UniProtKB/Swiss-Prot annotation:
Plays a major role in the shutoff of the host protein expression by cleaving mRNAs probably via an endonuclease activity. Also reduces viral mRNA accumulation. This host shutoff allows the virus to escape from the host antiviral response. Hijacks host RNA splicing machinery to selectively target host RNAs containing introns for destruction. This may explain the preferential degradation of RNAs that have undergone co- or post-transcriptional processing. The record marks R195, K198, R199 as: Important for efficient shutoff activity and nuclear localization. The probable endonuclease active site in the N-terminus and the basic amino acid cluster in the C-terminus are important for the shutoff activity. The C-terminus acts as a nuclear localization signal. The C-terminus is recruited to host protein complexes involved in nuclear Pol II RNA processing. Pfam families: Flu_PA. The lineage of its organism: Viruses, Riboviria, Orthornavirae, Negarnaviricota, Polyploviricotina. It comes from Influenza A virus (strain A/Wilson-Smith/1933 H1N1) (Influenza A virus (strain A/WS/1933 H1N1)). The record marks L28, L65, K202, K203, K206 as: Important for efficient shutoff activity. The modification N-acetylmethionine is found at M1. This is Protein PA-X. Changing L28P: Drastic loss of shutoff activity. Belongs to the influenza viruses PA-X family.
Amino acid sequence: MEDFVRQCFNPMIVELAEKAMKEYGEDLKIETNKFAAICTHLEVCFMYSDFHFIDEQGESIVVELGDPNALLKHRFEIIEGRDRTIAWTVINSICNTTGAEKPKFLPDLYDYKKNRFIEIGVTRREVHIYYLEKANKIKSEKTHIHIFSFTGEEMATKADYTLDEESRARIKTRLFTIRQEMASRGLWDSFVSPREAKRQLKKDLKSQEQCASLPTKVSRQTSPALKILEPMWMDSNRTATLRASFLKCPKK
Protein backbone atom coordinates (compact mmCIF):
# COMPACT_ATOMS: atom_id res chain seq x y z
CA MET A 1 0.00 0.00 0.00
CA GLU A 2 2.81 2.42 0.83
CA ASP A 3 4.35 1.95 -2.62
CA PHE A 4 0.93 2.52 -4.20
CA VAL A 5 0.47 5.78 -2.29
CA ARG A 6 3.89 7.11 -3.27
CA GLN A 7 3.29 6.27 -6.92
CA CYS A 8 -0.26 7.56 -7.21
CA PHE A 9 -0.30 10.82 -5.26
CA ASN A 10 1.47 14.11 -5.74
CA PRO A 11 4.75 14.12 -3.75
CA MET A 12 3.68 17.23 -1.83
CA ILE A 13 0.46 15.51 -0.73
CA VAL A 14 2.49 12.50 0.41
CA GLU A 15 4.81 14.79 2.36
CA LEU A 16 1.89 16.51 4.10
CA ALA A 17 0.40 13.12 5.00
CA GLU A 18 3.73 11.96 6.44
CA LYS A 19 3.94 15.10 8.60
CA ALA A 20 0.37 14.63 9.82
CA MET A 21 1.00 11.02 10.86
CA LYS A 22 4.27 11.95 12.53
CA GLU A 23 2.49 14.72 14.46
CA TYR A 24 0.08 12.15 15.92
CA GLY A 25 2.80 9.57 16.56
CA GLU A 26 1.57 7.11 13.92
CA ASP A 27 3.85 4.84 11.89
CA LEU A 28 3.00 4.95 8.18
CA LYS A 29 4.90 1.68 7.70
CA ILE A 30 2.25 -0.02 9.85
CA GLU A 31 -0.78 2.25 9.40
CA THR A 32 -0.58 2.08 5.61
CA ASN A 33 -4.35 2.27 5.15
CA LYS A 34 -4.47 5.46 7.19
CA PHE A 35 -1.61 6.81 5.08
CA ALA A 36 -3.66 6.19 1.94
CA ALA A 37 -6.80 7.65 3.52
CA ILE A 38 -5.03 10.86 4.57
CA CYS A 39 -3.55 11.36 1.10
CA THR A 40 -6.96 10.80 -0.47
CA HIS A 41 -8.62 13.26 1.90
CA LEU A 42 -5.96 15.90 1.23
CA GLU A 43 -6.35 15.53 -2.51
CA VAL A 44 -10.14 15.88 -2.31
CA CYS A 45 -9.77 19.05 -0.23
CA PHE A 46 -7.42 20.59 -2.79
CA MET A 47 -9.63 19.54 -5.70
CA TYR A 48 -12.62 21.05 -3.89
CA SER A 49 -10.84 24.40 -3.96
CA ASP A 50 -9.50 24.14 -7.51
CA PHE A 51 -10.51 26.84 -10.01
CA HIS A 52 -13.06 28.47 -7.69
CA PHE A 53 -12.77 32.23 -7.27
CA ILE A 54 -14.78 35.29 -6.29
CA ASP A 55 -14.81 38.14 -8.82
CA GLU A 56 -14.88 41.91 -8.29
CA GLN A 57 -18.68 41.82 -7.96
CA GLY A 58 -18.49 39.22 -5.22
CA GLU A 59 -19.85 36.45 -7.44
CA SER A 60 -18.49 32.92 -7.41
CA ILE A 61 -16.90 31.92 -10.72
CA VAL A 62 -14.96 28.97 -12.09
CA VAL A 63 -11.78 29.86 -13.96
CA GLU A 64 -9.61 27.09 -15.37
CA LEU A 65 -7.14 29.02 -17.51
CA GLY A 66 -6.44 32.05 -15.34
CA ASP A 67 -6.84 35.64 -16.56
CA PRO A 68 -3.88 37.75 -15.37
CA ASN A 69 -6.01 40.89 -15.71
CA ALA A 70 -8.84 39.61 -13.54
CA LEU A 71 -8.93 40.64 -9.89
CA LEU A 72 -9.92 37.35 -8.36
CA LYS A 73 -9.95 36.09 -4.81
CA HIS A 74 -9.79 32.42 -3.91
CA ARG A 75 -13.26 31.31 -2.86
CA PHE A 76 -11.93 28.71 -0.44
CA GLU A 77 -9.28 28.97 2.24
CA ILE A 78 -7.51 25.64 2.62
CA ILE A 79 -7.02 24.73 6.27
CA GLU A 80 -6.42 21.00 5.95
CA GLY A 81 -2.75 20.11 5.56
CA ARG A 82 -1.44 23.04 7.58
CA ASP A 83 0.48 22.78 10.83
CA ARG A 84 -2.05 22.81 13.69
CA THR A 85 -0.73 26.06 15.16
CA ILE A 86 -0.83 27.80 11.79
CA ALA A 87 -4.26 26.34 11.04
CA TRP A 88 -5.74 27.80 14.23
CA THR A 89 -4.07 31.13 13.47
CA VAL A 90 -5.74 31.15 10.06
CA ILE A 91 -9.10 30.26 11.63
CA ASN A 92 -8.80 33.02 14.22
CA SER A 93 -7.99 35.49 11.45
CA ILE A 94 -11.01 34.37 9.43
CA CYS A 95 -13.32 34.63 12.44
CA ASN A 96 -12.04 38.09 13.34
CA THR A 97 -12.47 39.29 9.75
CA THR A 98 -15.80 37.69 8.88
CA GLY A 99 -17.47 37.34 12.26
CA ALA A 100 -17.82 33.59 11.77
CA GLU A 101 -18.23 31.42 14.86
CA LYS A 102 -14.98 29.73 15.84
CA PRO A 103 -15.27 25.94 15.41
CA LYS A 104 -14.30 23.56 18.21
CA PHE A 105 -12.51 21.22 15.81
CA LEU A 106 -10.21 22.02 12.91
CA PRO A 107 -12.33 22.13 9.72
CA ASP A 108 -10.91 21.52 6.25
CA LEU A 109 -11.91 24.65 4.34
CA TYR A 110 -13.54 28.04 4.67
CA ASP A 111 -15.97 29.24 2.00
CA TYR A 112 -15.70 33.03 1.58
CA LYS A 113 -18.77 33.08 -0.66
CA LYS A 114 -21.17 31.43 1.79
CA ASN A 115 -19.20 32.45 4.88
CA ARG A 116 -18.96 29.04 6.50
CA PHE A 117 -16.40 26.44 7.47
CA ILE A 118 -16.55 23.13 5.63
CA GLU A 119 -15.75 19.63 6.87
CA ILE A 120 -14.89 17.26 4.02
CA GLY A 121 -15.34 13.52 4.46
CA VAL A 122 -14.19 10.65 2.26
CA THR A 123 -15.62 7.30 3.25
CA ARG A 124 -15.32 3.65 2.28
CA ARG A 125 -18.71 3.00 3.91
CA GLU A 126 -22.27 4.26 3.49
CA VAL A 127 -22.28 8.04 3.13
CA HIS A 128 -25.22 8.61 5.48
CA ILE A 129 -23.54 6.63 8.29
CA TYR A 130 -20.32 8.61 7.97
CA TYR A 131 -22.26 11.86 7.74
CA LEU A 132 -24.03 11.15 11.02
CA GLU A 133 -20.71 10.30 12.69
CA LYS A 134 -19.23 13.60 11.52
CA ALA A 135 -22.28 15.58 12.60
CA ASN A 136 -22.28 13.91 16.03
CA LYS A 137 -18.60 14.74 16.51
CA ILE A 138 -18.77 18.36 15.36
CA LYS A 139 -22.11 19.17 17.01
CA SER A 140 -22.33 22.51 15.27
CA GLU A 141 -24.85 23.68 12.69
CA LYS A 142 -22.40 26.38 11.62
CA THR A 143 -19.93 23.93 10.05
CA HIS A 144 -21.07 22.60 6.69
CA ILE A 145 -20.45 18.89 6.07
CA HIS A 146 -19.86 17.34 2.65
CA ILE A 147 -19.21 13.61 2.34
CA PHE A 148 -17.91 11.75 -0.73
CA SER A 149 -17.61 8.00 -1.25
CA PHE A 150 -15.53 5.86 -3.57
CA THR A 151 -18.74 4.68 -5.27
CA GLY A 152 -19.78 8.12 -6.50
CA GLU A 153 -22.27 8.86 -3.73
CA GLU A 154 -22.26 12.09 -1.76
CA MET A 155 -24.18 13.73 1.07
CA ALA A 156 -24.11 17.31 2.31
CA THR A 157 -25.78 19.42 4.98
CA LYS A 158 -29.31 20.34 3.88
CA ALA A 159 -28.49 18.87 0.44
CA ASP A 160 -26.40 21.97 -0.28
CA TYR A 161 -23.50 20.64 -2.34
CA THR A 162 -21.65 23.98 -2.58
CA LEU A 163 -19.87 23.17 -5.85
CA ASP A 164 -21.21 22.91 -9.38
CA GLU A 165 -21.90 19.45 -10.76
CA GLU A 166 -18.81 19.38 -12.98
CA SER A 167 -16.44 20.15 -10.10
CA ARG A 168 -18.00 17.44 -7.97
CA ALA A 169 -17.84 14.99 -10.87
CA ARG A 170 -14.10 15.61 -11.12
CA ILE A 171 -13.70 14.59 -7.47
CA LYS A 172 -15.91 11.51 -7.86
CA THR A 173 -13.99 10.40 -10.93
CA ARG A 174 -10.68 10.67 -9.09
CA LEU A 175 -12.00 8.65 -6.14
CA PHE A 176 -13.36 5.97 -8.47
CA THR A 177 -9.98 5.82 -10.23
CA ILE A 178 -8.18 5.37 -6.91
CA ARG A 179 -10.55 2.53 -6.06
CA GLN A 180 -9.92 0.84 -9.42
CA GLU A 181 -6.16 1.17 -9.08
CA MET A 182 -6.26 -0.31 -5.57
CA ALA A 183 -8.45 -3.18 -6.75
CA SER A 184 -6.11 -3.96 -9.65
CA ARG A 185 -3.28 -4.35 -7.13
CA GLY A 186 -5.32 -6.41 -4.67
CA LEU A 187 -5.35 -3.61 -2.09
CA TRP A 188 -8.98 -2.55 -2.05
CA ASP A 189 -10.36 -5.28 0.24
CA SER A 190 -7.80 -4.58 2.95
CA PHE A 191 -8.41 -0.84 2.57
CA VAL A 192 -12.13 -1.33 3.22
CA SER A 193 -11.92 -4.01 5.92
CA PRO A 194 -9.71 -3.52 9.02
CA ARG A 195 -9.83 -7.28 9.65
CA GLU A 196 -8.55 -7.99 6.15
CA ALA A 197 -5.87 -5.33 6.61
CA LYS A 198 -4.56 -7.04 9.78
CA ARG A 199 -4.53 -10.41 8.01
CA GLN A 200 -2.60 -8.92 5.09
CA LEU A 201 -0.10 -7.23 7.44
CA LYS A 202 0.61 -10.54 9.24
CA LYS A 203 1.04 -12.23 5.86
CA ASP A 204 3.49 -9.55 4.70
CA LEU A 205 5.52 -9.73 7.93
CA LYS A 206 5.72 -13.52 7.69
CA SER A 207 6.82 -13.25 4.08
CA GLN A 208 9.56 -10.78 5.05
CA GLU A 209 10.84 -13.16 7.76
CA GLN A 210 11.03 -16.02 5.26
CA CYS A 211 12.93 -13.90 2.76
CA ALA A 212 15.35 -12.36 5.27
CA SER A 213 17.83 -15.26 5.03
CA LEU A 214 17.76 -15.46 1.23
CA PRO A 215 20.55 -13.95 -0.95
CA THR A 216 19.62 -10.48 -2.13
CA LYS A 217 19.95 -9.53 -5.77
CA VAL A 218 19.98 -5.79 -6.36
CA SER A 219 18.05 -4.64 -9.42
CA ARG A 220 19.63 -1.86 -11.47
CA GLN A 221 16.46 -1.30 -13.46
CA THR A 222 14.97 2.14 -12.98
CA SER A 223 11.32 2.62 -12.10
CA PRO A 224 8.93 3.45 -14.95
CA ALA A 225 8.55 7.17 -15.47
CA LEU A 226 5.41 8.59 -13.92
CA LYS A 227 3.08 10.16 -16.45
CA ILE A 228 1.94 13.68 -15.71
CA LEU A 229 -1.78 14.41 -15.66
CA GLU A 230 -3.41 17.77 -16.25
CA PRO A 231 -2.49 20.21 -13.42
CA MET A 232 -5.35 20.54 -10.94
CA TRP A 233 -4.23 23.82 -9.35
CA MET A 234 -3.92 27.32 -10.79
CA ASP A 235 -0.92 29.59 -10.33
CA SER A 236 -0.89 31.28 -6.93
CA ASN A 237 1.79 32.04 -4.37
CA ARG A 238 -0.46 30.73 -1.62
CA THR A 239 -0.37 27.10 -2.75
CA ALA A 240 2.33 27.13 -5.41
CA THR A 241 4.17 24.11 -4.05
CA LEU A 242 0.97 22.08 -4.05
CA ARG A 243 -0.07 22.89 -7.59
CA ALA A 244 2.26 20.44 -9.30
CA SER A 245 0.67 17.95 -11.67
CA PHE A 246 -1.04 14.88 -10.28
CA LEU A 247 0.82 11.65 -10.98
CA LYS A 248 -0.77 8.70 -12.68
CA CYS A 249 -0.24 5.25 -11.19
CA PRO A 250 2.09 3.19 -13.40
CA LYS A 251 0.53 -0.08 -14.47
CA LYS A 252 2.20 -3.27 -13.35
